[in-house]
Every structure is written in structure tokens, then in C-alpha cells.
């Protein structure tokens, strides 16, 4: 299944369907869920990153339970905006995941999403390192998905 842009994904969603945002890290995948009006992204949880088939099965379960009609994954562009090896690996992973889950997918620039979330948790929430580690993945997914929703709002 090819990747789509955010406008195409929004156009493919059925009535009352949501988007599931993914922030894939080395150890975990942060998850965020949009509301059905596609205006608000909320942190949803995190999955342990492992075999693609296991991750895909869990995302299929979440999608069925939550009425998800599309996936949006973070795209780790280089700081200068170029498409480097990390972005290519993320793109390849997302195409494979989309095919296994059976949902259309888009990617969205995630540069500095984890940094922004960490900074907020340190400065504004005054959280410990351990508590930040528990939250950062799903909050980064929410931050990324909210950016995608805001940029493509109609």
C-alpha cells in the first residue's frame, strides 16, 4: 500500500473514523488518537517495538476497537529538512506496517517532537526522568499528530 499525504488520508476516512498517530522509537512506539472531528490529538499509549507482525496485530486490534481509518507516522527528516537514512528506514517500515494492518498511511515531519515534549515535561511539569520516560513516546505521538491535523484542517 503506498503512502498518502495528509489531505488524501483525511479524504479517505469514513464518517466517525479517527487517525492513529505513531511515533516509532528504537524501543517503543508512541501512540496518539485523533477525535472523530479530526481536530484534537490525544496521547493513547505505547507499544514495545518488536517484530512487525506483532506490532501490526496490536495496531489492528486498536484500530478496530477505536474506529481508526488511517495511520500517521512521524517522519524523522534531518534538521536541514533532507531525507536521510533514518527517514528512508521509517518510510519503509511504515509502508510495511500499513500493508500488514490494512489501513492507509501518511507520514508527517516529526523533527524535534520528542525534544519539545521533553522540554515541556522538564520545565513546565517538573517531572522526574523515569516519569518522563514513561510519557514521552505517547506525548510525542500526540504532538506530531496534532501538528498534522492543524496543518491540514479544512
From Swiss-Prot:
GO terms for biological process: rRNA 5'-end processing. It is found in: Cytoplasm. SMART domains: YqgFc. Keywords: Cytoplasm, Hydrolase, Nuclease, Ribosome biogenesis. One of its GO terms (molecular function) is nuclease activity. GO terms for cellular component: cytosol. Pfam families: RuvX. Its EC number is 3.1.-.-. Belongs to the YqgF nuclease family. Could be a nuclease involved in processing of the 5'-end of pre-16S rRNA. This is Putative pre-16S rRNA nuclease. It comes from Gluconacetobacter diazotrophicus (strain ATCC 49037 / DSM 5601 / CCUG 37298 / CIP 103539 / LMG 7603 / PAl5).
